[in-house]
Amino acid sequence: MKAPKFLFIAVIIVGLSGSLTWASPLPKAKAVADAMAAAEALAEAEPEALAPIFALLLLSGLFSLPALQHYIEKNYINGK
């Protein structure tokens, strides 16, 4: 069976256009730019994210003071 000439031409054109699109540097550059933007956003947001953590640690320490005071009064000041 003899294949038509236009079929070979169509296969070659589709193959080349697909490989040229796949090998294009533009999608890679966009992916790298997106990754860099995400890394910069994380670097800028990190100090802001630490403030609530320190606030929670401080509050947990302050809320434990009444329990500590009760323990000291019960065991050391008033005796067991």
Curated annotation (Swiss-Prot):
Its main location: secreted. It comes from the Eukaryota. One of its GO terms (molecular function) is sodium channel regulator activity. Residues 1-23 form the signal peptide. It is found in: Secreted. GO terms for cellular component: extracellular region. Residues 24-49 form a propeptide. Expressed by the venom gland. Keywords: Amidation, Ion channel impairing toxin, Neurotoxin, Secreted, Signal, Toxin, Voltage-gated sodium channel impairing toxin. The modification Asparagine amide is found at residue 78. Vertebrate selective toxin that causes pain by targeting tetrodotoxin (TTX)-sensitive sodium channels in peripheral sensory neurons. Is able to inactivate rapid activation and inactivation currents of Nav1.7/SCN9A (on mouse channel EC(50)=18 nM, on human channel EC(50)=30 nM). The leak current is via the central pore of the Nav channel. Induces a strong hyperpolarising shift in the voltage-dependence of hNav1.7/SCN9A activation, while voltage-dependence of steady-state fast inactivation is unaffected. Belongs to the formicidae venom clade 1 family. This is Delta-myrmicitoxin-Ta3a.
